[in-house]
Amino acid sequence: MLRAAGDITGERQFIIIGSQSIHAKHPDRFAGATISLELDLFAKNHPERTEQLNAIGQESRFHETYGYYADPVDSTTAVLPKGWQGRLINMPVTETNGVAGLCLDPHDLLISKYVAHREKDIDFNREVMASGVVDAERLLALVDITPVDETARRRMRGYIEHDRRLADSAPAKADLAGNTDK
């Protein structure tokens, strides 16, 4: 998809902000994240070109052919902690004609999902927390630099603590891709 996005927009770098961004740091994990049919992304250097990605968006010929699609977003789609841009991770990809995907650090990704607080985000965060690849203390620190009100901060802290307790009390188990770390 990155190659197609680059061909359409002339851009060489895209920021990926949705659940698929977990694959930059953990490419062989989290089958739950691979269930998503869309890739939430925007052009890094010329965000105004992002709208052109509708050509490979939902119900496009690209979507019909490959079964997945681009979901053009912008930098305000997800509420992220201060400094997230400096923590972006290069997605290891091949066959993209030099087009790069820059993905959220897993901690920033989870914070954005704690803010959104949709059922699918709650499930995703629990899966990632249970895997042990994120640190609850770091998540709690990021809550303090996330641009949300104090009510949202309290809710986020409560969910992080709850998810940490669930992860700590669960026996060593495989994530949906069959990997074990605990």
Where are these regions (language model features)?
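Compositionally biased terminal segments of proteins
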Residues: 1-182
